[in-house]
């Protein structure tokens, strides 16, 4: 009999996934799986669920939660050298990576996709020793998901992120950074940067429209310091996916980046990694090609 481990975060999103547990078990038992479930009891304990897979002959690992939960599970998989296909159920507030894989918003439909979808080898990013599947970001908006109240986030969803970001804009100071690739060094005052593995971040589905999780490269997008009215125009371009050629955008592709802050007063600036608080600058970012197996709902990821 095949074995599947389901790991879920009961606090993710609207907290409704628990109502689908029996349907999940019934669906997978119906096609010959022995089902084991791990329910997160506190922040940071999803690693314990992944540990339960070690040397237990599992065939499939499934995580239900948002980008942060997926990130935690993936880091645990890499830590314990677990080479199993990962199915993702988008049960969080932000589900950018699941969207990239074509996973449906309907939870029960996801069960079918995980059972019938294609297993793909995809790239992983690493920043200062921590893995990320979708994005590493810094600057404006990077701390939004860490500062926003959980109830506020769960009630308003992505709108909560945007409202908090707008609140930050008038008082945010540009960050002077040095961006290094294998071939060039750029010094610029910027409002924010994104290192993308997938195409979307923060619900913006077209922000990394040229990115691919199978191309062996990461996409860097940085927004240069500029007047607020120009940011408003750039925001419209981002929504339309027409921002990469804008003069106020730095756009690079490479397999590694180094980002340093040129002003010591910003030395405590932290990053965001898949929606969770990340390391402080400076950042060393690398790509690991085809490091993870995921279940996808689309052929070309």
Describe the residue ranges of each PLM region.
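ATP/NTP phosphate-donor binding region
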Residues: 1-64, 184, 301
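Glycine-rich phosphate/pyrophosphate-binding beta-alpha loops
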Residues: 137, 141, 194-207, 277
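Catalytic core of DAGKc-family lipid kinases
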Residues: 31, 40, 79-191, 195
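ATP/nucleoside-binding phosphotransfer catalytic cores, i.e., glycine-rich phosphate-binding loops
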Residues: 181, 187, 212, 222-301
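Nucleotide donor/acceptor-binding cores
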Residues: 2-4, 84, 255
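Gly/Ser/Thr-rich active-site loops/lids in small-molecule metabolic enzymes
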Residues: 152-160, 209-229
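Short Gly/Thr/Asp-enriched flexible loops that form oxyanion-binding sites at enzyme active sites
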Residues: 68-84
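Short, well-ordered alpha-helices that flank and scaffold nucleotide-derived cofactor binding pockets
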Residues: 22, 26, 51, 75-79, ...
């Amino acid at each position: 009999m095949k074995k599947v481990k389901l790991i879920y975060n009961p606090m993710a999103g609207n907290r409704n996934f628990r109502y689908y547990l029996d349907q999940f078990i019934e669906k997978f038992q119906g096609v010959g799986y022995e089902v084991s479930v791990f329910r997160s009891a506190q922040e940071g304990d999803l690693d314990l669920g992944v540990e339960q897979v070690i040397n237990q002959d599992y065939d499939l690992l499934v995580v239900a939660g948002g980008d942060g939960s997926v990130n935690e599970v993936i880091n645990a998989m890499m830590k314990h050298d677990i080479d199993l296909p990962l199915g993702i159920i988008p049960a969080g507030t932000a589900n950018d990576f699941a969207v990239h894989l074509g996973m449906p918003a309907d939870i029960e439909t996801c069960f079918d996709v995980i059972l019938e979808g294609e297993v793909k080898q995809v790239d992983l990013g690493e920043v200062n020793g921590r893995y990320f599947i979708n994005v590493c970001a810094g600057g404006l908006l990077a701390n939004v998901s860490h500062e926003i109240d959980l109830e506020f986030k769960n009630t308003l969803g992505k709108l909560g992120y945007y409202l908090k970001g707008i609140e930050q804009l008038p008082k945010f100071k540009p960050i002077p950074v040095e961006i290094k690739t294998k071939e060039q060094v750029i010094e610029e005052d910027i409002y924010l940067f994104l290192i993308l593995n997938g195409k979307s971040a923060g619900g913006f589905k077209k922000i990394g429209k040229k990115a691919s999780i199978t191309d062996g490269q990461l996409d860097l997008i940085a927004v240069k310091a500029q007047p607020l009215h120009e940011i408003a125009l750039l925001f419209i371009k981002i929504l339309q996916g027409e921002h990469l050629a804008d003069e106020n955008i730095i756009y690079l592709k490479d397999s590694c980046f180094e980002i340093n802050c040129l002003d010591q007063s910003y030395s405590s600036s932290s990053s965001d990694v898949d929606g969770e608080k990340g390391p402080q600058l400076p950042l060393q970012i690398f790509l690991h090609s085809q490091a993870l197996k995921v279940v996808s709902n689309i052929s070309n990821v």
